[in-house]
Amino acid sequence: MVGAAAAEAATVRYYSVAPDVRLNVRSGPGTSYGIIRVLPEGAKVPIYCQTPGTSVSGPYGTSNIWDNISNGEYVSDAYVNTGSDGYVADRCS
């Protein structure tokens, strides 16, 4: 198992997206990847694993961490309230 599939075997926590933000979900860990969909305001996301990518500035600071929220779907950690500036989940493999 790899990526989100492997992480699904573990306990997954859900985290809130920053208030008043419609967050782009991308096909990879960076702003150069295509937008797959947009999360609505008030969304909560699971974090299956995290990986480094494009550095992004958002409500929770500047971060190069990207959160894998589903198979092939990533959001910038700078927009997710994890309570930490670092990794809160295993790194994606």
Label every PLM stretch briefly:
Residues 4-6, 66:
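A generic alpha-helix preference that emphasizes hydrophobic side chains
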Residues 29-34:
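Short alpha-helix capping/helix-loop boundary micro-motifs
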Residues 37-85:
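SH3/SH3-like beta-barrel superfamily modules
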Residues 6-27, 38-41, 86-93:
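SH3-family beta-barrel domains
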